[in-house]
Amino acid sequence: MPFFVVKRDLPGVTPEILQSAAVRAKSCCAEMTGEGQPVRWVRSFYLPETAQTHCYFEAASKSAVEEANQRANIPFTQIVEVMEMTPEMV
């Protein structure tokens, strides 16, 4: 399945808000997967200097990732398909 990055601008976000969003994202992905539309939240990185997060998902489509984030009520500015590269792959 393809990978996607979800970019977010979250000025004023707190660790508690991030934790709550993570719980909702995990729950909504599990819910959608149970409904036959697999979405997997892989990981997120918070960039404190810019108050942004980059959240990585694996799903069949961009629209599935968008739906998971909407269900979780987590705002986003952009969703982009990405290509995974790791040191082990080269």
Residue ranges and their predicted role:
Residues 2, 37, 75:
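Residue-level signal for beta-strand positions within conserved beta-sheet cores that form or flank
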Residues 5, 54-56:
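Conserved hydrophobic/aromatic beta-strand scaffold that supports enzyme active sites
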